[in-house]
């Protein structure tokens, strides 16, 4: 148990080391291009079931963290996220693509005019926001057959304020914490499994 505790401490230090490297990259924002973001949605069953699609691509990057959120008149809700990273963020950069999908259900028209924001971060970040429009007239008998609507450039609206600041460090900390957390959990799970097997012998 003592060894496991020491190893966990080492893992935490290593994770914090990775945090410093990536946070520095976020602060200077150089070395790779911001992720590309594309979005689409379907509003089915008389505008009761809203399905949102968010594709994020980052090239030649140490990692990609992406997510989506929706802002209705009364509240903002974080929907989903995904993280992929290189084991050697300093030297090994890859091409990443995330395809996020999330479905929301509510009374007819609940999410009409709500704003949806999709983003991706690889040390710098890209984000896009659109307003949900009714699809009642785009369905077959207004029941269940809807056409996926791909969001066009002229449909985009301003991103929320924290995406527009010249200094995004506070927001970047939230996203990059996901990367460190995933690394820590994977390593901690491995240590626990190794310790358990050793004591079984």
From Swiss-Prot:
Residues 1-25 form the signal peptide. It is found in: Host membrane. It comes from Human cytomegalovirus (strain AD169) (HHV-5). Keywords: Glycoprotein, Host membrane, Membrane, Signal, Transmembrane, Transmembrane helix. The chain crosses the membrane at residues 171-191. This is Uncharacterized protein UL120. It is a single-pass membrane protein. GO terms for cellular component: host cell membrane; membrane. Glycans are attached at residues 46, 49, 55, 84, 95, 113, 122, 137, 144. Belongs to the HHV-5 UL120 protein family. Residues 192-201 are cytoplasmic. Residues 26-170 are extracellular.
């Amino acid at each position: 148990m003592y060894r496991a505790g020491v190893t966990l401490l080492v893992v935490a230090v290593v994770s914090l080391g990775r945090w410093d490297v990536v946070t520095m990259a976020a602060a200077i924002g150089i070395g790779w291009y911001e992720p590309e973001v594309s979005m689409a949605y379907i509003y089915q069953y008389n505008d009761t079931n809203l399905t949102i699609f968010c594709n994020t691509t980052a090239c030649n990057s140490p990692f990609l963290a992406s997510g989506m959120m929706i802002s209705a008149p009364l509240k903002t809700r974080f929907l989903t996220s995904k993280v992929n990273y290189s084991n050697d963020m300093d030297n090994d950069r890859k091409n990443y693509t995330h395809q996020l999908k999330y479905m929301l259900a509510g009374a007819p028209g609940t999410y009409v005019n709500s704003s949806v924001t999709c983003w991706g971060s690889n040390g710098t970040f890209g984000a896009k926001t659109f307003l949900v429009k009714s699809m009642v007239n785009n369905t077959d008998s207004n029941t269940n057959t809807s056409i996926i609507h791909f969001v066009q450039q002229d449909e985009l609206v301003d991103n929320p304020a924290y995406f527009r600041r010249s200094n995004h460090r506070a927001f970047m900390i939230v996203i990059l914490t996901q990367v460190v957390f995933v690394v820590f959990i994977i390593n901690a799970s491995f240590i626990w499994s190794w310790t358990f097997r050793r004591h079984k012998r």
